[in-house]
A protein has these predicted regions:
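Short, well-ordered beta-strand elements within core beta-sheets of diverse protein domains
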Residues: 13-19, 79, 98-102, 214-221, ...
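Acyltransferase
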Residues: 24-29, 58-61, 276-297, 321-326, ...
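Conserved hydrophobic/aromatic pocket- or pore-lining residues that grip, position, or stack substrates
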Residues: 31, 53, 75, 81, ...
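Structural helix-boundary/capping segments
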Residues: 37, 116, 167-270, 284, ...
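Flexible, acidic loop-helix segments that line cofactor/substrate-binding pockets
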Residues: 43, 240-248, 262-263, 268-270, ...
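Short glycine/serine-rich loop/turn segments
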Residues: 73-216, 269, 376-397
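Short helix-loop capping/hinge segments that flank enzyme active sites or metal/cofactor-binding pockets
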Residues: 73-96, 258-267, 310-365, 377, ...
Length: 464
């Protein structure tokens, strides 16, 4: 069987490399060639690590020649949002200011763990400055364009990560999610994006935005790739005090268990309003495929979103306060304005937001006593045009940048695990549906996604 390296998923590539059907060097060389030819059209990469990638690929081939198993992701090319430390590169976090920092001396924990699983790093990816945004329109490094329509945004803040997978440049990337920065671009680019439980994966060596909310997670074009990557990334890490010490729970062995024992519901109320019809139709399509007839009401999600904004803006502004005072001109104007607004939030608002967060977490946990999975839209509509400032949602004109996260913020606010799954629509742009579970139940989410994938309801073909 001849492997189409552009279309094959990570699991298939790794299996072919381990079986000796193709070399890791050939796979990585092909990825580097695709990046060289096609990246200019989408502006996904801010750095390409060609030399080290080819060296690492050769080491994988040598290990296989000696009868060793290099890991579940042997020879698979991957790339990461440029807020992850990569040894030898400066960690930009999408900013001009960070470009003055010295190169990182070691890889972020997540990068190191994927390398330990045999994956080969090929570069760093574009993002909104300091991860504050949903569009990846960056005044320093340019806009990342959506492979489905290059006149439109890829989403953000992990836009380079989602577009690189959707365009077939690499099968696997890492991003981060504070308020929706994995799920929004996954939806707009038509791929899978997992935001695990808060604290499940180590963030050590990643440039954080708002520590109360920051998560890391993978993008891929198949459910098994998400599961394999998630499993490779799990594990305690003393370098990140938020990272859990609870044992890893492998999701890949559970992937084909089916969903007969799962109680699944659709989120109504807030999550069934304030969206374009096609976003709600995507949820209905998934619900129908899963024979879901139950609905649940998540209480006060609009307040959760407001509280998430207060905490995010306050923590982000505090982190960057010195530079906001001394060199405001060096920030992306859109980011600077939001951070400056954050400096003016009263401390008692922040305290009230954190108190509400506890109340909200308890109420949502009560819902999960009666259901295992909740379905909701990922974004309120399809990808907006580059430079578009306003969009119409449910007949109302609203700002693009904050409102792309309308349905994601109330969920990351309490650290729930969520997978955005892609609904492809012939002749139209893709949309995502969120599959949501209680903390540490990623394996249940992935089982649901696997059923939908097997039915052909969700899929992530590369954009030709």
């Amino acid at each position: 069987m001849t492997l189409d390296l552009e279309k094959a998923d990570a699991v298939a590539i790794a299996a072919a490399i381990r079986a000796g059907e193709i070399t890791a060097k050939a796979v990585v060389s092909a990825a580097l060639e695709r990046i060289a030819v096609r990246n200019e059209a989408f502006n996904c990469f801010t750095a390409v690590t060609a030399d080290t990638a080819l060296t690492d690929a050769q080491k994988i081939d040598q290990a296989i020649a000696q009868g060793e198993n290099p890991g579940s992701l042997a020879g698979v090319p991957f790339a990461v949002k440029n807020l992850f430390n990569i040894a030898g590169l400066t960690t930009l976090a999408g900013s001009k200011i960070n470009a003055e920092n010295p190169p990182a001396t070691q890889d972020a924990t997540a990068v190191a763990r994927l390398k330990q699983a045999g994956a080969v790093l090929v570069g760093a990816l574009n993002m909104d400055e300091y991860a504050y945004g949903f569009v990846t329109e960056n005044s320093h490094y340019g806009s990342t364009r959506n492979p489905h329509d290059p006149t439109r945004v890829a989403g953000g803040s992990s836009g380079g990560s989602s577009a690189a997978v959707a365009a077939g440049l690499v099968p696997l990337t890492l991003g981060s999610d504070t308020n929706g920065s994995i799920r929004v671009p996954a939806s707009l680019c038509g791929i899978f994006g997992l935001k695990p439980t808060y604290g499940r994966l180590s963030r050590a060596g990643a440039f954080l935005f708002s520590s109360s909310f920051d998560h890391i997670g993978p993008f891929a074009r198949s459910v098994r790739d998400i599961a394999t990557t998630f499993d490779s990334l799990q594990g305690a890490d003393a370098s990140d005090p938020i990272c859990t010490t609870r044992p890893a729970e492998r999701s890949l062995p559970q992937l084909n268990k089916g969903i007969e024992d799962l109680r699944i519901a659709v989120a109504d109320g807030y999550f069934a309003k304030g969206a374009e019809p096609e976003a709600l139709e995507a949820v209905a399509k998934v619900a129908q495929a899963l024979a879901v007839t139950t609905a649940v009401t998540i209480p006060e999600p609009h307040r959760a979103r407001a509280a998430a904004y207060i905490i995010t803006a306050s923590e982000g502004a505090n982190l960057h306060f010195a530079n906001l005072r001394s060199r405001p001109q060096d920030f992306d104007p859109a980011t600077r304005d939001r951070f400056l607004a954050g400096t003016m939030i009263p401390a008692n608002w922040y305290i009230q937001a954190q108190r509400f967060r506890q109340w909200y977490r308890d109420r949502v946990r009560e819902i999960f006593q009666n259901v295992d999975i909740i379905l909701a839209p990922t974004t309120p509509g399809v990808a907006p045009l580059l430079g578009q400032e306003k969009m119409v949602i449910a007949g109302e004109e609203v700002l693009v940048r904050p409102n792309l996260g309308l349905f994601t913020q109330p969920l990351s606010f309490i650290g729930l695990p969520v997978l955005s799954v892609p609904i492809q629509r012939p002749g139209a742009l893709p949309l995502g549906v969120q599959i949501i579970a209680a903390p540490y139940n990623e394996a249940l989410i992935l089982r649901v996604a696997a059923v939908l994938e097997a039915q052909g309801i969700v899929s992530a073909p590369i954009v030709q």
